[in-house]
């Protein structure tokens, strides 16, 4: 799940190799000490966006495990005491009404205006959320030339914090920014949850 154009910026290309090597080392240690048991190595796809382990857990893949070990590349070798953030990834899809931007813009309802107003609202929201809340966004799709009032726009948001409750609150407030922007522009908004995960320590 490399990032588009950038590639494996945080070492995801190493995950499978490292997990397999750890399993081999653990097997050798267990055999040398006469410890019986079964070691499994799972590939966990789509970690970057879809949080693949959540889907696997929901489907019972890990139900019969006594323990699980996971790892992530870092700039030094250590046992992590970090708090891994609770995160929501959402798409905000705005639908408007297309019109010619020069001849009859008053007939249009700009989905792009709605997306921009939403993002402005979120940027003003940053001062009024706890310090560990992060709200990242990108314009994901507009697909219209500049001389057409766009009837479609999509933004993608990552909303994170160190506690699930704070992420829930921030996500609700971002949703409200989207709904308010749609109301202001006479458009509609569809909120699509891409993935969600809890904090972990």
Task: For every predicted segment, state its role.
Residues 21-36:
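Flexible, small-residue-rich helix->loop connector segments that border functional cores
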Residues 16-21, 25, 56:
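Cytochrome P450 catalytic-core helices
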Residues 7-8, 23:
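Internal helix-loop-helix
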Residues 125-126, 175-185:
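A common structural junction motif
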Residues 146-176, 189, 195, 200:
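A conserved active-site cap/scaffold subdomain adjacent to cofactor or substrate pockets
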Residues 2-7, 13-14, 32-150, 160:
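Histidine/acidic-residue-rich, glycine-tolerant segments that coordinate divalent metal ions
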